[in-house]
Amino acid sequence: MSQQTYSLEGAGEGQVNITDASGDITIVGWSQPRIVIYADEDDQPEAQWQGNVLNVSHVHDAQLRVPESASVSIERAGGDIEVVAVRALRIGMAAGDTELSRVGELSLGTVAGDLEIEQAGQVSIDAVMGDLEIHSAAAVNVGRVNGGAELHRVGPLRIETTMGDLEVHEAEGVSLGQVFGDAELHHVGGDLMASTIRGDAEVESVNNVQLEKVSGDLVIRDVQGSVNAVVQGDISLHKLPSSQSHTVRADGDVALGLDPGPVTLNIQAHGSIRWDRSLGLTVQSDTRRQLVARLGEGGGEINVNAHGDVVVYPAGEERGRRGRGRHGWVMAGAGEGPRVPPIPPIPTIPPMPSLGGIPVAGVRRPPVNLVEERSVILKMLAEGKITAEQAARLLDALGDA
């Protein structure tokens, strides 16, 4: 293996531009003020060095050492990419898997394989055709993930489309477009907003929750703010804060755990409505399918509309809601309250607003010249720089752009 070395002039940070690579690329930052390219003797890339900028082309398999202060740009890569410890990184198109760690500003176009990121600053991604995994990032903005997505310890998170399952642990606010699998979100420091979740959803430790549509079941635990949700399955709400206003609609059953505190209940159900006697509710209207009740004076309001059954119990007694309750159940319309005219309809859930002046889950992408990109991919295939499988994945990715 031979090497090419380029020393920085003055206090320059360094810039590396790789226009096309047919093999695997490994780039590692170091404290030295120089750039070194390691490659086989027969596969030396073409390099031009001018003004602390290194332009590299015709790369097969290569390893590069660059200053940690350097910015790196990879236009197209036919193999796998690994980058460690650089100030900024931009990748236009990657046919293989991509692993990135300790990267400052990160901008990615299309990754045809899996993408793994650890310790990054601002992250912007157009499309990942495989799975996405991120551990620690200042902010994340994603257009499309064809596989599943797993994120830990991130700042504000926006994802437009996730075709697989989504799992988030610790985020400073989450904005989602469509999730075609299940969604699991824990410890969201800000608000959670989602347009569509086609599987089940589980939410824990979050401020405000707004879900326009959940096709499966919904479980919410430990909410600090309000909940607005439309669910086609069952809803389980554990410990809703009584000081907030909530509106939920379910095609299935609803289980509601009340936090001790003043609140007004407005419940409509096609099935039965039951509540635990220990709650001490003051019933205002009680029919077989409707209940208006109050706990204390003032507080928030909880609006429930269910096609199935509704059960209300003290927060923290989830097991009791399936049995008799601590002091037995009271059932609406069982003769313990007068029949009254229908109560006013439950308020509709407003459309999901923008977050911070940016459209929800929106990702701004530069325009793509599809004809030019397809020509480049086919040329790389003809020259043997990428395999037929890699070319097919890249062409499929362009078709989704």
Model-derived segments and spans:
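Intrinsically disordered, low-complexity terminal regions
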Residues: 1-401
